[in-house]
UniProtKB/Swiss-Prot annotation:
It catalyses: a ribonucleoside 5'-triphosphate + H2O = a ribonucleoside 5'-phosphate + diphosphate + H(+); a 2'-deoxyribonucleoside 5'-triphosphate + H2O = a 2'-deoxyribonucleoside 5'-phosphate + diphosphate + H(+). CDD domains: Maf. It comes from Prochlorococcus marinus (strain MIT 9312). It comes from the Bacteria. SUPFAM superfamilies: ITPase-like. One of its GO terms (molecular function) is nucleoside triphosphate diphosphatase activity. It is found in: Cytoplasm. InterPro entries: ITPase-like_fam, Maf-like. GO terms for biological process: nucleotide metabolic process. This is Nucleoside triphosphate pyrophosphatase.
Length: 206
């Protein structure tokens, strides 16, 4: 059984589309408590803390009975967009989104997604989750943006989609038409590397 330690709807949809059985439980970890400056490492550390936080509180959560059979995997992910060495989270407002898109237009950046899969066994009788393994990796994809006119940028921003996405764009949404190409894992840009997950779920027999 897999638990997605995230409230992300894009990650949820990726797993559903691939028919991977899972349950979704949002992690309550405070992301602002991590001060790591390296963007690559920050994505990985945040993914670990999300999964680890849920693993510590799992005994307080009502889980399906089948959770007692076989290994349990807790998946934490965090995505950060890097543009010319600067971390781009969600834009604070439309003005900031416009400034960022003016810079990104015709350029490229990197979408880093930290992945952590905590493996263990949960015994509902004793309410104990015993961790047997922790697998971590940051997967990076290079994203190339189309050269856009100001009116195109404004039209996109007026949809409000950029305000809810790391980097100010959503590949799976309206913003997808403004992306020229991707080098690396495609699904990683949507918040979860499916090839990485598949390989590790098979390895752990989840």
């Amino acid at each position: 059984m897999l638990i997605l330690a995230s409230a992300s709807q894009s990650r949820k949809k990726l797993l559903e589309n691939c028919q991977i059985e899972f349950i979704q439980i949002s992690s309550n970890f405070d992301e602002t408590s991590i001060k790591e400056k390296n963007i690559f490492n920050l994505a990985l550390e945040l993914s670990f803390q999300k999964a680890n936080s849920l693993s510590k509180s799992i005994k307080k959560i009502s889980l399906p009975e089948e959770i007692n059979y076989g290994p349990l995997g807790i998946l934490g992910c965090d995505s950060i967009f890097e543009f010319k060495g600067e971390a781009y989270g969600k834009p604070s407002d439309k003005a900031e989104a416009f400034i960022r898109w003016k810079k990104m237009s015709g350029e490229f950046g990197f979408l880093h997604t930290g992945h952590t899969l905590i493996i263990g066994n949960f015994d509902s009788t004793s309410n104990i989750f015993k961790i047997t393994d922790t697998i971590k990796k940051t997967v990076s994809s290079r994203v190339y943006f189309s050269k856009l006119e100001d009116w195109e940028i404004k039209t996109y921003i007026d949809t409000n989609e950029p305000l809810y996405c790391a980097g100010g764009f959503a590949l799976e949404g309206i913003g997808g038409k403004y992306i020229e190409k991707i080098e690396g894992c495609f699904s990683n840009v949507m918040g979860l590397s499916l090839p990485w997950l598949r390989k590790n779920l098979l390895k752990q027999k989840i």
